[in-house]
Amino acid sequence: MSENTTPETAAASVQDSFELPSAPDQFQRLWTPHRTAYVSGGQKDYTEKTCPFCTAPSRSDEESLIVHRGEHAFVILNLYPYNPGHLLVCPYRHIPFYDDATEAETLEIAQLTQLAMKVLREVSHNDGFNIGMNQGKVGGAGIADHLHQHILPRWSGDTNFLPIIAQTKTMSRTLDDMRVAIAEGFARLS
């Protein structure tokens, strides 16, 4: 990058000339080399002693960003949220896959997911959700050794190019503010 080049102009100047001659797709591609470490196996292996989802319940809710504790699972704010209110439902046990969960864990993860959706609607007034689990390193899980379900509130028009071009996310509320509001919502609705 030259002295006058910004991340925006650098990204805009990258040209993608790859097209199959028989099937032009008309898509432009934005290359994100900063993700190479992640997709090439840069994720850490966690043990029960080093796993952030195993150590979080032993700390205060404020310190760990936990918004609700159940018997077999808990709900925690994502430390690296896609949107304000991005929650994770985690079993207390250090298990990597959904089919490793007991019947009681499976039931409580489902119940906490439903409750979290109600809380987020009340607190955030979102328009929809993305809900899911990435399992295993090749499945895209950032912490592959400890099962967790993402609950991502969505609003109309909440997608933009800032994360890709400027490595910046716009967040309308701090994690602390969201933790308090969501924890209060869980207290009211559970």
State what each model feature region is:
Residues M1-S190:
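HIT superfamily nucleotide-processing domains
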